[in-house]
Amino acid sequence: MNGERHVAGRGRRRRPDGVRDVVEPRIAVAVVTMGNRPAEVDALLESVAKQDLAPARIVIVGNGCRLPEFAQRLSLPGEVTTVDVEENLGCPGGRNVALARLREYGDIDVVVELDDDGLLVDADVLRRVRDLYAADPRLGIVAFRIADEKGETQQRHVPRVGNSDPMRGGYVTGFLGGAHALNMEMLAGTGGWPAEFFFAHEETDLAWRAADADWKILYAPELLLRHPRTSPARHAIYYRVTARNRVWLVRRRLPLVLIPVHLGVWSLLTLLRTRSADGLRAWLGGFVEGLREPAGERRPMRWRTVWRLTRLGRPPVI
């Protein structure tokens, strides 16, 4: 590397094969935080500042908190925007705030969303993201690989069924909420995050909408976010909200005939895997809540999307 640093601006460059010019997408980075991880947020933003392709914009959302000054203190590149939200809107709601601000600016093509306690280890992540989107105009979502401090990737962080190799990239049916890139043109058609979910399964809702609109979802393990090893059950609301949102998800997105199949398979797996009696009680309460409460707009996927997801290795009943 020659030490040069570029800003992610929309321009044209010649492809290596010399066939045609490629439009370079403008990249933004969005981070949502509740203000309880100041050191981790600083470290994450410093890792963004070290990228060899600087983002055109950085948006930081304080989800129910007031944010400190970041831009000058951390020498952040690009245009830096902070947004304080009075109440905690949950992760999807907070990310919608960032997306709304980026839409107002109207000059961003791809947004990279990162968990506030993650860290970009490599300096070429944003450049690689830019190149992936420049090469494929129908690329909707890029899923990063998430690994802990030891470099290990938990199986739940691999967007495939079964014990899949975390280093095997390719097209998939879902993505990880902790680190990913989203095509702004795609979001204009599919809509943003399901804010009412607050936490859990919001990625699947967005992924299914993207797939149904014929956008591609790519798992790119070379794009690494280091993240502390955690369990989703660490959240007090985990069992209830996971169950409620799963029911909402299938009510919103699946053809009617597949809804009982999906819920039956998922319920059986939950009963086999869950060892906590309190957790099962909370899960059952969430399941009932998901059936009783409005699930939001019903927009079931087409049967050809069901087949496409099945061919990619994850039929939407698992």
Give residue spans per PLM region:
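Short, acidic, metal-binding catalytic loop of nucleotide-sugar glycosyltransferases
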Residues: E46-P55
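Active-site donor/metal-binding and catalytic loop motifs
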Residues: A213-I237, W248-L249
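Glycine-rich, basic loop-to-helix element that forms the pyrophosphate-binding segment
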Residues: V85-Y105
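A short, conserved alpha-helix in the catalytic core of glycosyltransferases
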Residues: G174-L182, M186-G191, E196-L224
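Short beta-strand-to-loop acidic/aromatic patch adjacent to the donor-nucleotide binding site
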Residues: D107-L119
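Non-catalytic, C-terminal membrane-associated alpha-helical segments of glycosyltransferases
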Residues: V241, L256-I318
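Conserved donor NDP-sugar-binding/catalytic core segment of glycosyltransferases
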Residues: A123-Q154
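A recurrent flexible, glycine/aromatic-enriched loop bordering the glycosyltransferase active site
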Residues: D148, S164-L182, T204, R234
